[in-house]
UniProtKB/Swiss-Prot annotation:
Segments crossing the lipid bilayer: none
S5 DRBM domain boundaries: 11-74
Protein name: Small ribosomal subunit protein uS5
Keywords, in A-Z order: Ribonucleoprotein, Ribosomal protein, RNA-binding, rRNA-binding
Functional description taken from the UniProt entry: With S4 and S12 plays an important role in translational accuracy.
Entry GO terms, CC: small ribosomal subunit
Family: Belongs to the universal ribosomal protein uS5 family.
Native species: Halalkalibacterium halodurans (strain ATCC BAA-125 / DSM 18197 / FERM 7344 / JCM 9153 / C-125) (Bacillus halodurans)
Lineage per the UniProt record: Bacteria, Bacillati, Bacillota, Bacilli, Bacillales
C-alpha cells in the first residue's frame, strides 16, 4: 500500500472525541486531554489520529498531524461502497452496507464522521458491540480498508468483471 501525501490534498478535519484524564497528585488533580480526530478530502481518502497534551488545542493539533500520517484510500462506486462488510477492532464491530442513491449517510456519531469525510454519500451502517468512539472509528476505517472494487478482484483472479459477476 502506497502512502498518500497529505500536502497535495484539501483535507477537512472533524474532532470526534475529547477525553479528559485526571492524575491525582498531592496538590490536587492534574488534567490532560486526549483528542480523536478524523481527516478526509470527501473524495475517497480518510484517516484518523490520536493526540494527547496538557491543553485541548495542542491535543487536537497532534491528533490532526497523526491522522494525516494514516490516510487510506476508500473505493467508492458512484456514491456508495462496492459491497457489504463488517469492520472489526477489539470489541467494536461496524456493519457497512451499500445503499441506493438518495439514501444518505445513515450512521451514528464517530462512524458518520469517518464516512462523511471519506466522501461516501449513501450508506447504511450499524455499530455492534463496543460503542467506544476510538474502537468504532478504528473498526470503520478497518472495514473501509478491506473493501475491494469488482475490477480489482477480477484482475487478481485473472477474469473479467462479467465472468466474476456471472
Amino acid at each position: 500500500m502506497r502512502r498518500i501525501d497529505p500536502n497535495t490534498l484539501e483535507l477537512e478535519e472533524k474532532v470526534v472525541a475529547i477525553n479528559r484524564v485526571a492524575k491525582v497528585v498531592k496538590g490536587g488533580r492534574r488534567f490532560r486531554f486526549a483528542a480523536l480526530v478524523v481527516v478526509g478530502d470527501k473524495n475517497g481518502r480518510v484517516g484518523f489520529g490520536m493526540g494527547k497534551a496538557q491543553e485541548v488545542p495542542e491535543a487536537i493539533r497532534k491528533a490532526v498531524e497523526d491522522a494525516k500520517k494514516n490516510l487510506i484510500e476508500v473505493p467508492i462506486v458512484g456514491t456508495t461502497i462496492p459491497h457489504e462488510i463488517v469492520g472489526r477492532f477489539g470489541a467494536g464491530r461496524v456493519l457497512l452496507k451499500p445503499a441506493s442513491e438518495g439514501t444518505g449517510v445513515i450512521a451514528g456519531g464517530p462512524v458518520r464522521a469517518v464516512l462523511d469525510l471519506a466522501g461516501v454519500g449513501d450508506i447504511l451502517s450499524k455499530s455492534l458491540g463496543s460503542n467506544n468512539p476510538i474502537n468504532m472509528v478504528r473498526a470503520t476505517v478497518k472495514g473501509l480498508q478491506e473493501l475491494k472494487r469488482a475490477e480489482d478482484v477480477a484482475k487478481l483472479r485473472g477474469k473479467t468483471v462479467e465472468e466474476l459477476l456471472g
